[in-house]
Amino acid sequence: MLSWIFWILLSITLHELAHGWAAIWEGDYTPIETGHMSGNPLVHMGGFSLIVFALIGFAWGMMPVRPWNFRHRRWGDAIVSVAGPAMNLLIAFVTLTSLGIWLGLDSTMLQHGQPAWKEHVSNFLQLGGFLNLVLFAINLLPVPPLDGSRILSAFSSTLRGWYQHPNAGMAGMVLFFLLLTTNAFDWVVLLLGTFAVRYTAAIASIF
């Protein structure tokens, strides 16, 4: 439970900070002006997200930006949007690589089991890597208000107009929760889990 809380809070914070860093690079200093370039996860999550986190153990964050300040009018929003999932992917690779090295340096852990404290370390790293792979995939879904919708809108004015509809965000969230409750996302989770295991094993084999 504590590991889950740690990884959720860290992943959300770094995800949102990545959006902020990209926005600043694009010429928008709103993240600094609003005090959101902070390592405090409470700054990014907000009240409703915290309530949902307390109830079901999942949450989300927000980084305020002003797209009209971006240097690249068409691609700026896509650049800022892709920065968040890219951060999740980076966390996943760093964590899974660390897990592979951890296991590879002590091959007896794979053959004869692990002492309790070593198993805790392995589980901790495994959770962080897998969770961030899932967050990467979820955020790339082309469903507003997820990052994937903003990335895709850069390639199509028609999609951009639809995504900017006042009800698009609500419709997108309903569709997103339907995907989760109907297990339509399960095959993606299975694919990511398989990748995580094989990647970790490949790293471990080097050592």
Feature map (PLM): residue ranges:
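Hydrophobic transmembrane alpha-helices and their immediate loop junctions
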Residues: 1-207
